[in-house]
């Protein structure tokens, strides 16, 4: 608006200058009489040099308001407003073109589990291949015949068990299964017979007695070693006397071998006796006794270690089906086996399926979610007639073909003309017919000195009204009058004129463009009923109707019957309630063709008669033969007329086609009372159709009954015309009138500002140019006049429901419907009308439901548009209908909102040139008008093709011939060869002016003239103002690759930017081990810890020094009674005994201090650029930078000629220079850039001189020398932005400038070389899907079109050839401190691409790139190698305090310490909540959450923290939100993963739902510990010891990491208690989904810390596959320890 105000002010200032300067010019002609010879014009001098800018003038008067400006740029997004009331539903816009293909949608919900594939043939254990993508589980195959024993394959997936009543064939021997759960001891069996004695075993050497071992650790979950020997039992009762060999000699005792006695029961232990003296030495060892009888069955011993697998035994008898075993580890992928034979279907015996009766109809459920779009169903039978639609006229259909000429209608009564309020002044009208010849004016002798014309005279008296002339040719559109001076006061309305004589019939025009939709007219009174027409032929199937309401009555429940044959038609039902007025009836039949009237010869003109009455509408003329004419301008909206009298019904017409236009939905009516329900009658025999009855008077509205809707009633007679309506609203401003006759040239004005002038007149059509580039989308043109009604098109698809129509008149009351009296329901709130749903497939016949309440249900969601059905058959074309009478004009509609800019449509075909109209008579010249104010800048005119110059016309010096009739455009000639330019001719003498002839009477239309020669090219219009920024266009096609631009001078360094956001998580780096850092400095000694509880006994240490003599041991078991020996003398001292037992382990040394911090490692590689983000709003234009300090580079090569710039603002006018002598013609110079248009020249003589012959061509001139540089002018206002020039040639490289501010992101370059795999990035925000451009078809190459706008900057060219290698090797210096930010340098030209230098040192990480658009989902990557163990994470924040736990047992008295607590979480991996360890307090208990996965990204919980123990379980515990303040829950393909229990999966392997999930979810407890808790891992199968001063809380297995869907997952910090699970399972977690199901899947993996032998630490790990039963032999053990307080 500011710009418009400036241009207005400048225009008014110019006007003031021109008015003020007129007396000076008039003085040059002072005293000239009309007959004298004054030379007032002077000799026109050469065009002077542009003067210096003049002083700024005074501000002008305020200008008139300018035309409405173009739409401004989109403003910034405002704050959210208060939600307004719901507005009325807008008018449905026309359907848009099909959009571009959208970006691929987000992944859908996972499909149902596929059927398992057949079991493959076990292959050999191959070498471990690359990890493949996880396959889907196959179906279990049938048991095949036993093959020859192959090499044992890897363990397969557990197969399904098919229960069969018959015993199967004998199976192959299985591998040893894992040990089962220990059963209850069975009853004692009958002792079996004594077996034969086995062969004697080899005698083993007796082993030395071992030392007593230390007490072992807590046992493992699997079979441990045999326990220690128990304590001495009580003394048993005395046994039966044994057979003792006689004593032969007192000393030389010899025992004879006795028989084996029966084992006695164990007696109670006797009291310990007093230690006796040492007994005499016993006798010699007797012989080994014979094998005793087997004793009773002992107690079950502890489980031994797993033995080695034995040799496969012979096949045993088939066993009973075992319990399902635990899931084994997933084996390696075997080779693909050959396809197996087709399996047999083994039905399960004894399970017949009986189909029960159909249940009662249920209560209506809640509206379901919107389903997926289904496939189109098969074509159903035609539905019942739908209820009558609202009587609202739909939008006009497409123009049909012209119908045959109809009969002339009867003359209607004259309408009542209600004058409206006076409209605004219209544009100047077309010139009227010439009046009678006026008196001759004064004769002006021919002379070369013509004075300026005098002031305009008074208006003349109006002439007599002439005859109505033929329709003249439509004139060119006149120039738009911007800033017209003066607003006339509207005059009073004139008297209505007398009717004119009937005009001759016009020729048939072609359909124009569709006009704007008018407002709906006022509803007329109800018409009389019309005579019913004869039934039409059956039409084609209409579009699918709305589903009708189904009212059913309760009956007895029957079985579903077979489909019966069609019954006879029933008796006519009772009359239904009258429907709303129906759509207009079918058109009548084709009438007889009328006679063709020919136009008679034109008679001599008679005297003007009084205007006659308006004639009847003439018969339609014969169709024209020419091609369609151009689109006409939109007509003025007329005032609504009164409805006409009813016409006589036409005779029967051929059946027409019905196009159903959906009307607007009506307002909801008030609910009526329930009617009495009658019993349904039996169907009667079909009766004959009765005659139509006389319409009854309008009754009171009846009570609506419950019943099926009746068929639509017959169309009523047209109604009696209503009273005249109220005066209409004032009409719109009329069309722009044709241009007036040209005035005489005005006096020379002051040099104006070089504002752009209006565009020149259009030239004659040039030769057809080649198809130019596709232009920008223009603003919508004015609507054309309404086209003629076309033939009915084929039925279109059913449209969406339109807006509500006006309520129709109240119909007569209907008869009471039949129905059962329902109970009165509570009044419901009427819901809005829902969208019509698709027809479903007919379901089974349901039981009749109870009658529903008359309450509209809640609106359903709008369904997805269905897939287009198969096209119906094309029906035969209907006969053309009679032309309808002109309807009353509707009220002007409100202008619709400007629609969104549509995508560019395809270029339409070239139209056929129209026939020329009858030439109009030339009008008289008008009086000279005042010069208008300069108009605003027009739109930039398109450059016209130059026409061929015409030859000079014959010249009569006395008479100036009148303008000849415009001939038909000639066919385009073949372009001639370009000849050499002729020499410049001398200017000819001006010719004598001719006398003005009197205008003749209108002649008859002349014959068709010969084609005229092409006219002179029009003047080049000034450039228009820069248009406003349009809406974002769709992506254009790929431009032609532009030439590489010149290199820019490096800018100055900018200020240090703000720290960037956190970069994306990189991909895993190349697995290499970084250099270890230097040891850090020793830390300060810590505070002394709290004394801990006694630790578990340590493992066996190295042999210690000989211990002190031990204390006397416990009494041994009593030996056999010895015989007393003789006491011997004391012997000498014996030799030293063996070393004693190892001593207790020593105290561990103090903890060392922390090391020095290591040096930082080398910087990592630069991460890959992130995905494109959502495009931000357009940034504000930056301020211009300061001039740089760089030295100017050498001058670049001359650039190509730039495109024409826009005209600048005028400078201050300078003093006029003296006219110099005209120089000789120079040599032909290079073409210069076209300058702005010059000021208008002085007026020439008022008479047209003859056109001179073209002069001979002058020799080409030499280029002139460049003039000296002038002084700089005053700074002008900011010019309008010129068009973007073409890129120049590359200049020489400039000096490097300082680094500039960070610019906006550039266009995406060509892809570089593939970088190394970066680390995996965090997920980017999802980008907005772009519109992918569709590649258009290649056009036919045409001849060169006019010069197009410069194209968009092409993508960067390919890299140039490598230049010579550089010389200096850059060595990275130490980074200096950041300097003061310099001024930004001017952007230099880009230099040519230099050679590839040597690789420099790794630079610092770059600025984060903008998020890219989301790419398409790539294929799943291969699983990477496990990364190095990460550093333990920092401890998380303490959670909020939970509710008080149960009262714990009283703790031991603690030492005084500062009160502090640490939260840990213990997971039971069962359905029972775990107990908190001793010394901790329970905070709360919950369910064990392992990790969640959303938007294909996983986020894990540390199982040792409280965050992994959610107090409530849900298969989808989270939801996701976006930037639009919208959150979605359980509506996407997201997952949650929970620790699971040992509960086996059901045999069907179906996903778990509902309450069946609960047994599979592990429970957990959050405990508060008084000190820090850590986990220690042994990396062996031995349980590690807690550090000294720490107490054990629990032991377990070292759980490290887990992955599942999409190879996503998370892991545990090995220092956290969450990395030490108390139970090992190969599948320790279960996957749950947002749809409420959980299941185990084959792509779920758990990762456990493995055992490492000390000797194998730095050698290559050996591949190994462990089967079930051996899994725990390679899994590291761990212990969770708490610091002793």
UniProtKB/Swiss-Prot annotation:
Domain of life: Eukaryota
Annotated Basic and acidic residues bias: 246-257, 284-305, 324-333
Spans annotated as Disordered: 49-1459
Principal subcellular localization: secreted
PROSITE patterns: NC1_IV
Post-translational modification as stated in the protein's UniProt record: Prolines at the third position of the tripeptide repeating unit (G-X-Y) are hydroxylated in some or all of the chains. Type IV collagens contain numerous cysteine residues which are involved in inter- and intramolecular disulfide bonding. 12 of these, located in the NC1 domain, are conserved in all known type IV collagens.
Ranges where the record places region Nonhelical region (NC2): 27-41
Name of the protein this chain belongs to: Collagen alpha-5(IV) chain
Sequence segments annotated as region (Triple-helical region): 42-1456
Disulfide bonds: 1476-1567, 1509-1564, 1521-1527, 1586-1681, 1620-1678, 1632-1638
Associated pathology: Alport syndrome 1, X-linked: A syndrome that is characterized by progressive glomerulonephritis, renal failure, sensorineural deafness, specific eye abnormalities (lenticonous and macular flecks), and glomerular basement membrane defects. The disorder shows considerable heterogeneity in that families differ in the age of end-stage renal disease and the occurrence of deafness.
GO biological process, one term: neuromuscular junction development
Record's function text: Type IV collagen is the major structural component of glomerular basement membranes (GBM), forming a 'chicken-wire' meshwork together with laminins, proteoglycans and entactin/nidogen.
GO molecular function: extracellular matrix structural constituent conferring tensile strength
Result when mutating residue 1567 to R: In ATS1; juvenile type
Chain intervals with Low complexity compositional bias: 52-61, 214-225, 413-430, 788-797, 882-901, 912-931, 983-999, 1010-1026, 1111-1120, 1295-1308
A GO cellular component annotation in the UniProt record: extracellular region
Effect upon mutating residue 230 to R: In ATS1; juvenile type
Effect of residue 1486 to A: In ATS1; adult type
Bias kind Pro residues: ranges: 62-73, 188-212, 266-281, 431-445, 493-505, 620-630, 709-727, 848-859, 868-880, 1139-1148, 1234-1243, 1256-1274, 1353-1362
Effect of residue 1538 to S: In ATS1; adult type
Annotated consequence of substituting residue 365 to E: In ATS1; juvenile type
Cross-link (S-Lysyl-methionine sulfilimine (Lys-Met) (interchain with M-1549)): 1667
Notes on the domains: Alpha chains of type IV collagen have a non-collagenous domain (NC1) at their C-terminus, frequent interruptions of the G-X-Y repeats in the long central triple-helical domain (which may cause flexibility in the triple helix), and a short N-terminal triple-helical 7S domain.
């Amino acid at each position: 608006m500011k710009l418009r105000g400036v241009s207005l002010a400048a225009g008014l200032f110019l006007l003031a200058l021109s008015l003020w300067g007129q007396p000076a010019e008039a003085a040059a002609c002072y005293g000239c009489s009309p007959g004298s010879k004054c030379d007032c014009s002077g000799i026109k001098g050469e065009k002077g040099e542009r003067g210096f800018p003049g002083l700024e003038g005074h501000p002008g008067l305020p200008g008139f308001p300018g035309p409405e400006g173009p739409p401004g740029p989109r403003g910034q997004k405002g704050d959210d407003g208060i939600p307004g009331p719901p507005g009325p539903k807008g008018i449905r816009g026309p359907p848009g073109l099909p959009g571009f293909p959208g970006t691929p949608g987000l992944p859908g919900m996972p499909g149902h589990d596929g059927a398992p594939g057949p079991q493959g043939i076990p292959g050999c254990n191959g070498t471990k291949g690359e990890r493949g993508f996880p396959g889907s589980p196959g179906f279990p195959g049938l048991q095949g015949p036993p093959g020859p024993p192959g090499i044992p394959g890897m363990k397969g997936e557990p197969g399904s068990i098919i229960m069969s009543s018959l015993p199967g064939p004998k199976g192959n021997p299985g591998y040893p299964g894992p040990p089962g759960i220990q059963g209850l001891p069975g009853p004692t069996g009958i002792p079996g017979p004594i077996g034969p004695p086995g062969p004697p075993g080899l005698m083993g050497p007796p082993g030395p007695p071992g030392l007593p071992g230390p007490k072992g650790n807590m046992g493992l979950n699997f079979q441990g070693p045999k326990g220690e020997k128990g304590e001495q039992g009580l003394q048993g009762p005395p046994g039966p006397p044994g057979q003792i060999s006689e004593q032969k000699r007192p000393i030389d005792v010899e025992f004879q071998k006795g028989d084996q006695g029966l084992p006695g029961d164990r007696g109670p232990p006797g009291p310990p006796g007093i230690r006796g003296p040492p007994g005499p030495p016993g006798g010699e060892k007797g012989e080994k006794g014979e094998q005793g009888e087997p004793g009773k069955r002992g107690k079950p011993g502890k489980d031994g270690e797993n033995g080695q697998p034995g040799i496969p035994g012979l096949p045993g008898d088939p066993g009973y089906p075992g319990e399902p075993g635990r899931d084994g580890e997933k084996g390696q992928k075997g080779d693909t086996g050959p396809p197996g034979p087709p399996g047999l279907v083994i039905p399960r015996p004894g399970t017949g399926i009986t189909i029960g009766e159909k249940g009662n109809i249920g209560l209506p459920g809640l509206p379901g979610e919107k389903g997926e779009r289904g496939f189109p169903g098969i074509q159903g039978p035609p539905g019942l007639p739908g209820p009558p639609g609202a009587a609202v006229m739909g939008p006009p259909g497409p123009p049909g073909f012209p119908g045959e000429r109809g009969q002339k209608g009867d003359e209607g009564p004259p309408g009542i003309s209600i004058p409206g309020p006076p409209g605004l002044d219209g544009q100047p009208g077309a010139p009227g017919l010439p009046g009678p010849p006026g008196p001759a004016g004064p004769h002006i002798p021919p002379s070369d000195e013509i004075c300026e014309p005098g002031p305009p005279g008074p208006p003349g008296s109006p002439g007599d009204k002439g005859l109505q002339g033929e329709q003249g040719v439509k004139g060119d559109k006149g120039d738009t009058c911007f800033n017209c001076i003066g607003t006339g006061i509207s005059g009073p309305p004139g008297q209505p004129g007398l009717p004119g004589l009937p005009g001759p019939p016009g020729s048939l025009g072609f359909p124009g463009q569709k006009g704007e939709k008018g407002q709906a007219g006022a509803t007329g009174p109800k018409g009389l009923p019309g005579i019913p027409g004869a039934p039409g032929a059956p039409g084609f199937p209409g579009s699918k109707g709305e589903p009708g309401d189904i009212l059913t009555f309760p009956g007895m429940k029957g079985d579903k019957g077979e489909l019966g044959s069609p019954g006879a038609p029933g008796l006519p039902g009772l009359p239904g309630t009258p429907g709303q007025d129906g759509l207009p009836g079918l058109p009548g039949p084709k009438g007889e063709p009328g006679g063709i009237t020919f136009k008679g010869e034109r008679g001599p003109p008679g005297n003007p008669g009084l205007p006659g009455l308006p004639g009847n509408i003439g018969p339609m003329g014969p169709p024209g033969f020419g091609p369609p004419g151009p689109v006409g301008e939109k007509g003025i909206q007329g005032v609504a007329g009164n409805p006409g009298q009813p016409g006589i019904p036409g005779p029967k017409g051929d059946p027409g086609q019905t196009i159903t236009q959906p009307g607007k939905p009506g307002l909801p009516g008030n609910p009526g009372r329930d009617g009495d329900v009658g019993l349904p009658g039996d169907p009667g025999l079909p009766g004959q159709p009765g005659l139509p009855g006389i319409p009854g008077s309008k009754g009171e509205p009846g009570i609506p009954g419950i019943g099926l809707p009746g068929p639509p009633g017959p169309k009523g007679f047209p109604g009696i015309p209503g009273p005249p309506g109220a005066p209409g609203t004032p009409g719109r401003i009329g069309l722009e009138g044709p241009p007036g006759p040209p005035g005489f040239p005005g006096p020379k004005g002051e040099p104006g500002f070089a504002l752009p002038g209006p565009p020149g007149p259009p030239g004659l059509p040039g030769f057809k140019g080649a198809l130019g580039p596709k232009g920008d989308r223009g603003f919508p043109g004015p609507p054309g006049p309404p086209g003629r009604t076309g033939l009915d098109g084929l039925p279109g698809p059913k449209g969406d429901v339109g807006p509500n129509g006006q309520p129709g008149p109240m119909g007569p009351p209907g008869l009471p419907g039949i129905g059962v009296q329902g109970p009165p329901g509570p009044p419901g709130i009427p819901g809005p009308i829902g969208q019509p749903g698709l027809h479903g497939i007919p379901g089974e016949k349901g039981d009749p439901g109870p009658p529903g309440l008359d309450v509209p249900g809640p609106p359903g969601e709008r369904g997805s548009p269905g897939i287009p059905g198969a096209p119906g058959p094309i029906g035969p074309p209907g006969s053309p209908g009679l032309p309808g009478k002109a309807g009353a004009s509707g009220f002007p509609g409100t202008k619709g909102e400007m629609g969104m800019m549509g995508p560019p449509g395809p270029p339409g075909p070239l139209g056929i040139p129209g026939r020329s109209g009858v030439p109009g008579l030339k009008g008289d010249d008008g009086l000279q008008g005042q010069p208008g104010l300069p108009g605003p800048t027009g739109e930039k005119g398109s450059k016209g093709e130059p026409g061929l110059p015409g030859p000079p016309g014959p010249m009569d010096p006395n008479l100036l011939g009148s303008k000849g009739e415009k001939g038909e455009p000639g066919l385009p000639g073949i372009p001639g060869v370009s000849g050499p330019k002729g020499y410049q001719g001398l200017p000819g003498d001006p010719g004598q002016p001719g006398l003005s002839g009197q205008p003749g009477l209108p002649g008859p239309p002349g014959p068709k003239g010969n084609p005229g020669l092409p006219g002179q090219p029009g003047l080049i219009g000034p450039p228009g103002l820069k248009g406003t920024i349009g809406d974002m266009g769709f992506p254009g096609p790929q431009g032609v690759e532009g030439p590489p631009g010149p290199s820019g001078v490096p800018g100055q360094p900018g200020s240090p930017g703000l720290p960037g956001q956190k970069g994306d998580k990189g991909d895993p780096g190349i697995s290499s081990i970084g250099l270890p850092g230097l040891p850090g400095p020793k830390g300060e000694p810590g505070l002394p810890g709290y004394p801990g509880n006694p630790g578990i006994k340590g493992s066996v240490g190295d042999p210690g020094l000989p211990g002190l003599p031990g204390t006397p041991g416990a009494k041994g078991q009593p030996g056999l009674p010895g015989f007393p020996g003789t006491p011997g003398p004391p012997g000498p001292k014996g030799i030293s005994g063996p070393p004693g037992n190892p001593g207790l382990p020593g105290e561990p040394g103090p903890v060392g201090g922390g090391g020095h911090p290591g040096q930082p490692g080398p910087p990592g590689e630069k991460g890959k650029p992130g995905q494109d983000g959502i495009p931000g709003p357009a940034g504000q234009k930056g301020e211009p930078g300061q001039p740089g300090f760089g030295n100017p580079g050498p001058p670049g090569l001359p650039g190509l000629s730039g495109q024409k710039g826009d005209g600048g603002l005028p400078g201050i006018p300078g003093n006029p220079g003296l006219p110099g002598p005209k120089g000789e013609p120079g040599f032909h110079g290079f073409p210069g850039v076209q300058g702005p248009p010059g000021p208008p020249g002085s007026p020439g003589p008022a008479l047209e001189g003859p056109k001179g012959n073209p002069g001979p061509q002058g020799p080409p001139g030499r280029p002139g020398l460049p003039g000296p540089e002038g002084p700089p002018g005053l700074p002008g206002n900011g010019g309008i932005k010129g068009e973007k020039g073409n890129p120049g040639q590359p200049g020489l490289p400039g000096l490097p400038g300082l680094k500039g501010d960070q610019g906006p992101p550039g266009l995406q370059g060509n892809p570089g070389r593939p970088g190394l795999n970066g680390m995996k990035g965090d997920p980017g925000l999802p980008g907005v899907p772009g519109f992918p451009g569709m590649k258009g078809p290649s056009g036919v190459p045409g001849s060169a079109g006019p010069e197009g706008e410069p194209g968009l900057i092409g993508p960067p060219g390919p890299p140039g050839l490598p230049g010579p290698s550089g010389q200096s090797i850059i060595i990275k210096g130490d980074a200096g401190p950041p300097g003061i930010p310099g001024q930004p340098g001017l952007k230099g030209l880009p230099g040519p691409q230099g050679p590839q230098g040597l690789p420099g040192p790794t630079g610092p990480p770059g600025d984060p790139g903008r998020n890219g658009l989301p790419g398409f989902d790539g294929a799943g990557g291969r699983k990477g190698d496990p990364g190095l163990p990460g550093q333990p994470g920092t401890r998380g924040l303490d959670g909020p305090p939970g509710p008080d736990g149960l009262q714990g047992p009283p703790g031991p008295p603690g030492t005084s310490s500062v009160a502090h607590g640490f939260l840990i979480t213990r997971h039971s991996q069962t359905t029972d909540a775990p107990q908190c360890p001793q010394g901790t307090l329970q905070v709360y208990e919950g369910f064990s959450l392992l990790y969640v996965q959303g938007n294909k990204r996983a986020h894990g919980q540390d199982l040792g923290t409280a965050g992994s123990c959610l107090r409530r379980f849900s298969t989808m515990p989270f939801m996701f939100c976006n930037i639009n303040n919208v959150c979605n829950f359980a509506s996407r393909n997201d997952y949650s993963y929970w620790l699971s229990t040992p509960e086996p999966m059901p045999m069907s392997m179906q996903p778990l739902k509902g309450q069946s999930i609960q047994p599979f979810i592990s429970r957990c407890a959050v405990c508060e510990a008084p000190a820090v808790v850590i986990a220690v891992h042994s990396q062996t199968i031995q349980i590690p010891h807690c550090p000294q001063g720490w107490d054990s809380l629990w032991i377990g297995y070292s759980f490290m990491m887990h992955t599942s869907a999409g190879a996503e997952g998370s892991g545990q910090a090995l220092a956290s208690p969450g990395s030490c699970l108390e139970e090992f399972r190969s599948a320790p977690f279960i996957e749950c989904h947002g749809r409420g199901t959980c299941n185990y899947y084959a792509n779920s993996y758990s990762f456990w810390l493995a055992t490492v032998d000390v000797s194998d630490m730095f050698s290559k790990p050996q591949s190994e596959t462990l089967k079930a039963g051996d899994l725990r032999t390679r899994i590291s053990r761990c212990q969770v320890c708490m610091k002793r307080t």
